[in-house]
């Protein structure tokens, strides 16, 4: 049974990758890949995938104030437009690395806004809220 989905987000410079460093960019595409593949294509409920990507990792990492939207928890939120399809362009990723295996692939689930402890950390130019 799968209890969580996470990414170690291992960005490396092109030089590091040329020397065999393991890892890839994953943070910016993680939700869209999981939502498209698991929810849209395999039929898993969004609520289940959301829990696997929030409460699940918080439990595994023993982070008692993370993973839920509830009193006493940190206000860490991600707002997503699940109907927004986009094509990954590795050159436009915010990471220091551009080694993304999803470059050129299309996914649903565009992240529009992120909050960490209630403070805005990312806002898509396409977010109208």
Model-identified regions with their sequence ranges:
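His/Asp/Glu-enriched, well-ordered alpha-helical/loop segment
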Residues: 3-5, 9-82
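C-terminal cap of metal-dependent C-N hydrolases
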Residues: 22, 71-126
């Amino acid at each position: 049974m799968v209890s969580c989905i996470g990414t170690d987000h291992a960005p490396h410079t092109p030089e590091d990758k040329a020397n065999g460093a393991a890892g890839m960019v994953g943070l910016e595409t993680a939700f869209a890949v999981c939502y498209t593949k698991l929810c849209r294509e395999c039929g898993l409920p969004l609520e289940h995938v959301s829990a696997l990507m929030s409460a699940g990792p918080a439990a595994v990492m023993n982070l008692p104030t993370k993973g839920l939207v509830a009193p006493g928890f940190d206000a860490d939120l991600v707002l997503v437009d699940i109907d927004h399809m986009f094509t990954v362009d590795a050159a436009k990723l915010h990471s220091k690395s551009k080694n993304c295996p999803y470059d050129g692939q299309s996914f649903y689930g565009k992240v529009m806004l992120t909050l960490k402890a209630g403070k805005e950390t990312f806002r898509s130019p396409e977010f109208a809220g």
